[in-house]
Design a protein with these regions (language model features):
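General structural feature for long, well-ordered alpha-helical segments within catalytic domains
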Residues: 12-19, 31, 35-38, 224, ...
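Membrane-interface micro-motifs in multi-pass membrane enzymes
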Residues: 22-34, 123-124, 219
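Generic intrinsically disordered, low-complexity segments enriched for polar/acidic and small residues
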Residues: 9, 17-20, 30-33, 47, ...
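Helix-hairpin-helix/helix-loop-helix acidic hairpins
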Residues: 30-73
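Transmembrane and membrane-interface helices of multi-pass
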Residues: 1-25
Length: 445
């Protein structure tokens, strides 16, 4: 029964457990069968030559790196938004539309860092991108087809972003306006060190029912962001907050016929792709909501930094993607396929930061980049991933781009940096809880 309940919350829309080509594995075998045939491959195996003391020394060296000492008063509030299915499909191929579906984000330049994430999932498995961001660990060195939230995170994880920020005096609140049981978030967020979890299950404690806005079937981004800003409004004086928001507005599928929002239309493709157009219309709604959030934060009287990023591209019509590519998906090389795994991100602050554009990275490095930008001290994992990022700036479950921008398939990888990463990740996910961690977990109950 527990398995059935868990699986009922998984967004299986045109996705599967095969990280090389999730869409085709699903169509060939079906989602449940794809899950079944990969289960045997998902167990963590000790890396070749692994020694726990070597990993501990590696992390100790990373932790000892000199960092700027920052007064708590100078540290900003931190908002991280993982926006459901948020992507710019123009990365796949030339896409022309009746209007800009991301006008505000495209216009942002001041105090703004924009770029591209290389993610592992397509059309689903949101939790894997989320896992990478919150832990600094990578799907690229885990067994193919892994779902860490369901397999590997079963004890207190003191190296997560919320746990680290808790040590720095932050209050950490997760906001996800959907069922808390999905992807086991109710349990995972507790183990990750969040102090509070606002989900659809308890949303009426935080907001009047009449104030909850829906777009199609899901809580809107505007409402989701309002739950975030309400936390800022109601926090204690001097309290620093980390707010992690996983949105729902743009979740698939894209066949809603209520007509409650204007439609962005595609103008340069031969086919008529209603799902893709509905999706693009939703992205424009997200862009509007983000503009409202930034406007609010501009007038907020405490330094605050926000990052927004997507989890995966949407599973809209296969024919749409094939026309963008100019060829059948079955004819794509693994490197060509990576265009379906590239997602935008934006970092903005209501104070001066150095602006950048077209920065290429991955979700596992994004929290490190965020803390660097915010001038917040980092832990040993974040320092370690900073070093790996120099050699492997982008990584996903299929391979990585090296420092020269060359694609390296996972089966062809010989990177010493990734060997170390795999050892660190194995250690982090298999280590035993110490006494302090067990006591901390008990205190959070």
């Amino acid at each position: 029964l527990a398995f059935i309940i868990t699986m009922s919350c998984i967004d299986f829309t045109n996705s599967s457990m095969d990280v090389y080509d999730q869409y085709h594995a699903n169509n060939t075998h079906g989602s449940l069968y794809s899950f079944y045939i990969n289960v045997r491959k998902m167990m963590l195996s000790k890396p070749k030559g692994y020694k726990e003391e070597d990993v501990q020394a590696l992390l100790s060296n990373a932790d000892s790196e000199e960092q700027t000492t920052v007064d708590k008063e100078e540290m900003p509030n931190i908002i991280a938004i993982m926006n459901e299915s948020f992507s710019d499909l123009n990365v796949v191929g030339d896409l022309q539309t009746s209007e800009d579906y991301m006008p505000f984000i495209h216009s942002m330049t001041k105090n703004t860092i924009k770029g591209q994430l290389l993610v592992s999932p397509f059309g689903g498995y949101t939790c894997n991108t989320e896992f990478e961001f919150l832990t600094g660990l990578s799907m690229g060195v885990l067994p193919r087809g892994s779902v860490p939230y369901l397999q590997y995170v079963s004890k207190q994880y003191p190296f997560s972003l919320p746990s680290h920020l808790d040590e720095l005096g932050y209050k950490s609140v997760a906001v996800h306006p959907y069922l808390g049981r999905c992807w086991n978030r109710q349990k995972i967020y507790e183990l990750m060190g969040f102090d509070e979890f606002i989900s659809f299950d308890n949303i009426k404690k935080y907001m009047d029912e009449d104030d909850i806005e829906y777009v199609r079937y899901y809580v809107s981004d505007r409402t989701s962001f309002k739950l975030v800003t309400d936390q800022l409004e109601n926090k204690k004086p001097g309290e620093k907050m980390f707010l992690f928001n996983v949105t729902m507005q743009n979740h698939g599928g894209y066949t809603y016929d209520g007509g409650e929002f204007p439609t962005v239309t595609i103008s340069n493709l031969q086919g008529h792709y209603k799902e893709a157009e509905q999706y693009l219309s939703l992205i424009k709604e997200s862009d509007k909501a983000f503009e409202e959030l930034v406007r609010y934060l501009k007038n907020y009287d405490e330094p605050t930094i926000v990052v927004m990023f997507g989890d995966h591209q949407p599973a809209v019509e296969q024919e749409f993607y094939e026309e963008l590519y100019g060829k059948s998906l079955s004819k794509l090389s693994t490197e060509e396929l990576q265009q379906r795994y590239k997602i935008p991100f934006v970092i903005w602050a209501n104070y001066d930061i150095e602006s950048q554009d077209d920065l290429k990275t991955s979700p596992n490095y994004l929290s490190d980049l965020l803390l660097d930008t915010a001038n917040v001290p980092k832990n040993e994992i974040e320092n370690f991933t900073s070093e790996v990022r120099n050699d492997v700036p982008q990584i996903n479950a299929m391979g990585h781009y090296d420092s020269d921008g060359n694609w390296v398939s996972r089966d062809e990888d010989t990177s010493n940096a990734l060997d170390k990463y795999e050892a660190v990740e194995y250690y982090m996910l298999t280590r035993k809880e110490n006494k302090d961690e067990k006591e901390n977990k008990d205190d959070k109950k």
